[in-house]
């Protein structure tokens, strides 16, 4: 099994809240640093480990090694396949205002609608229809 692991810089909780709304899902589990290492980090609200299901794919998330610079120069982004243009656009509406477009949404020979963007947390996404 291959599991994408998304890293954030202290904003993992915000990302989880957005992804829960956009993808109509809930985090399966969240472990905070204060729970993971209570003696060392009793008041640390950063997330040590979280698990979500996004479109049928298990995804891990945490507050380590995040993309501080939010650079577009990245070799990896997550592709989400939608059954319809309407569902794609409804999900993208949650990201649109604070995202950076990498490739605008257009019709391609293999997809009715496809586009790439970086969300406000520095995660790069590709949304396309099946």
How does the language model describe each region?
Residues 1-3, 73-77:
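Short, solvent-exposed beta-strand edge segments and adjacent coil->beta transition regions
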Residues 10, 73-75, 115:
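Glycine-centered flexibility motif
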Residues 43, 71-74:
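Short glycine/proline-enriched turns and hinge-like loops at secondary-structure junctions
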Residues 6-56:
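Core segments of cupin and vicinal oxygen chelate
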Residues 28-29, 48-53, 63-70, 80-130:
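Vicinal oxygen chelate
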